[in-house]
Design a protein with these regions (language model features):
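Active-site catalytic loop in hydrolytic enzyme cores
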Residues: 84-91, 142-166, 340, 363-443, ...
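Juxtamembrane interface at the cytosolic side of transmembrane helices
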Residues: 556-581, 585-586, 593-594
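CN hydrolase (nitrilase-like) catalytic-core segments centered on the catalytic cysteine
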Residues: 102, 129, 278, 285, ...
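Soluble catalytic regions of membrane-associated enzymes that act on cell-envelope
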Residues: 218-392, 424-429, 434, 438
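Amphipathic beta-strand/beta-sheet edge segments enriched in Tyr/Trp
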Residues: 363-386, 504-530
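Serine residues within intrinsically disordered or low-complexity segments
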Residues: 2, 354, 589-591
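Membrane-embedded alpha-helical bundles of multi-pass enzymes
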Residues: 2-224, 258, 466, 473-475, ...
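Polytopic transmembrane helical bundles with strong interfacial aromatic enrichment
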Residues: 23, 46-48, 190, 201-202, ...
């Protein structure tokens, strides 16, 4: 570059508003690059630096700095969750709306952190992690929670570091990464602000101490891993590769069943020994179960189809008996086909499928469930788990149970009903508990499952996740979903195995190590031998105390700052802006102090 060009760039950067925008959108870019698909994970310790530079600025440049920050967040989230547009044209609306909502956390983080730094004089290495954790905790809770693309998730490969998730959760790991980044920022500033160099170096040292202490804790937790006891659970995870679309295809059910059956038989033939459990992903058995409430009276034509004509002299009691037999026959009809497959596999089988419960208590007469059904080697059903946490707008529309017309505005024909309780089934002397789809993305859902079953004396030895990620065409959604499961395994100290259509099927131990992983958008069968963990964890006992603690501290400090009288205040608030040309809003105080 010529001297004139360098001078031109220098002149451009001297404009405070342009520099501010560069930092805002530069941070959006770096925070995107540390997540899949780029996945430059080690840069996670540097990625927040542009936003931290904004936090440290005495004033924000430009007339609408908060709008600029929101726009930067909007650009970031549009790129980070671009895969949300893939399932159906209508989901592009959800992609934009969700990105617009998530974008608000960028200005919120900077506003909170600036209030702590400039309003209370807190060091950046304390203010930034607390503000970040508060925002991520709120993001994991508001509207049911959205936890993908968390800062802590970038570090899933650093097994020693993420052991602390069993105490502070994934949100806390993000706070630790932010503390490390803030320490680097303080160290960099110490070379510029020579008068405060000692203080800033002390802050950097404190941040390094936090990271070192986290690694020390992680090393200790890894040293406490239980020795293998008894035989591992031998699981065959079947991963087909069928891209999922919202369209009616009368041949799809048979094609999907044949696809998965062929893969299963091929997987079984690869070994002389049978696995303890075969697992198919979510909804890969397309002929759903049917249950009929005894309070529901079947049409007589349906009863005749199932049982034949009634006797001419049948009385009311016999009519009720025929109703009960017909209900049982309808339910058994769907189970009989499943039993054929289970007997051929000759072992336990966990299969994802839908279920309809016909009942007068439902507003439309039918409740729909997303289920995981256990069958034994003889084809007998052992237990059925109904998904407890349906995805908002993906599997149900809020208030549509009262206003059914809302479904006509979406590609969904109907909404799912939430299941009522978790299930654990004993297989080969191990207790196995299923989850479905994004339940592994919800920290409190998995914690609740383990705590509920533990209270009943049935703490799971293994959690199985059934998921159909074929909606997302092999995109970075697969990586984000798998990463969430890794953190859940550490938090509850329970191995997780995943059967995923199009990937990633996986086996994860109780320390978050990825033992097996299937390919992206391709078929595979994984033979995972899973050892229970069973360690207790602070997360199981206390939950998101670190995340909510950060929310409480930051909220209290922010409210206190807002209520604190400021007589004689002569400068704009810490989060305020200055005009583009940089003029002061009020005269400089005589003392020169800000």
């Amino acid at each position: 570059m010529s001297g004139a060009g360098i001078a031109q760039v220098g002149s451009w950067l001297r404009d405070s508003e342009r520099r501010f925008r560069l930092l805002a959108f530069g941070g959006a870019l770096t925070m995107f690059l540390v997540q899949p698909p780029a996945d430059l994970w080690m840069l996670g310790w540097l990625a927040p630096l542009p936003w931290l530079a904004i936090v440290q600025q005495p004033r924000l440049a430009g007339r609408r700095p908060w709008l600029v920050l929101w726009a930067a967040g909007f650009a970031h989230w549009l790129a980070a969750i671009h895969w949300l547009r893939l399932p159906h044209p209508a989901t592009s609306i959800g992609w934009v709306v969700l990105s617009a909502y998530l974008a608000a956390y960028v200005p919120l983080f900077i506003w909170l952190a600036r209030g702590l730094v400039h309003g209370h004089g807190w060091p950046l290495v304390l203010a930034a992690p607390l503000a970040w954790m508060a925002c991520e905790q709120l993001r994991s809770w508001v509207l049911g929670g959205f936890t993908f693309a968390a800062l802590g998730h970038t570090q899933w490969r650093w097994t020693t570091l993420i052991q602390a998730a069993d105490a502070v959760g994934a949100v806390g790991i993000g706070g630790i990464v932010m503390a490390g980044c803030a320490g680097l920022a303080a160290l960099a500033r110490s070379r510029i602000e020579t008068r405060r160099a000692g203080v800033l170096r002390g802050e950097a040292l404190a941040a390094a101490g936090i990271v070192v202490a986290t690694l020390g804790y992680g090393g200790w937790r890894l040293a406490t891993e239980p020795a293998p006891s008894g035989s591992p659970l031998d699981v065959l995870l079947v991963q087909g590769s069928i891209d999922t679309e919202l369209k009616h295809d009368p041949d799809a059910a048979g094609d999907v069943a044949r696809h998965y059956d062929d893969l299963t038989m091929a997987g079984l033939e690869q070994s002389d020994s049978k696995p303890d459990l075969v697992v198919w992903p979510e909804t890969m058995w397309r002929w759903g179960l049917v249950e009929i409430d005894p309070a529901e009276r079947l049409d007589e034509a349906v009863v005749e189809r199932m049982l034949g004509p009634a006797a001419a002299d049948a009385d009311a009691k016999q009519g009720e008996e025929r109703q009960a037999r017909a209900r049982d026959a309808l339910a058994r009809e769907r189970l009989d086909a499943l039993a054929v497959y289970a007997r051929r596999y000759g072992t336990h089988w966990l299969v994802g499928l839908d279920k309809q419960v016909i009942t007068p208590r439902a507003s439309g007469g039918v409740e729909y469930f997303n289920c995981g059904l256990f069958l034994d080697a003889a084809g007998r059903p052992l237990a059925c788990y109904d998904k407890m946490h349906p995805v908002m707008f993906g599997e149900y529309v809020p208030l549509a149970d009262r206003f059914p017309f809302l479904y006509r505005l979406t590609p969904l024909p109907a909404g799912l009903t939430a299941g009522r309780e978790p299930v654990a089934v004993e297989i080969a002397a191990r207790l196995v508990a299923p989850t479905i789809c994004y339940e592994t993305a919800l920290p409190m859902a998995v914690r609740g499952l383990v705590r509920t079953l533990t209270a009943a004396g049935r703490r799971p030895d293994v959690i199985v996740n059934l998921t159909n990620d074929g909606w997302f065409w092999g995109s970075s959604e697969l990586d984000m979903h798998l990463t969430a499961a890794i953190f859940r395994a550490v938090e509850v100290r329970t191995p997780i195995v995943i059967a995923a259509n199009t990937g990633f099927s996986a086996a994860i131990d109780g320390s978050g190590r990825l033992l097996e992983r299937g390919p992206r958008r391709a078929t595979a069968t994984l033979r995972a031998r899973v050892q229970p963990d069973g360690r207790r964890s602070p997360w199981l006992a206390l939950g998101a105390v670190a995340g909510w603690g950060a929310v409480a501290v930051v909220t209290a400090a922010t409210v206190a700052g807002a209520l604190r009288p400021a007589p004689g205040r002569t400068t704009a608030p810490a989060g305020g802006a200055v005009p583009k040309e940089g003029r002061r809003l009020v005269p400089e105080p005589r003392s020169g102090r800000e």
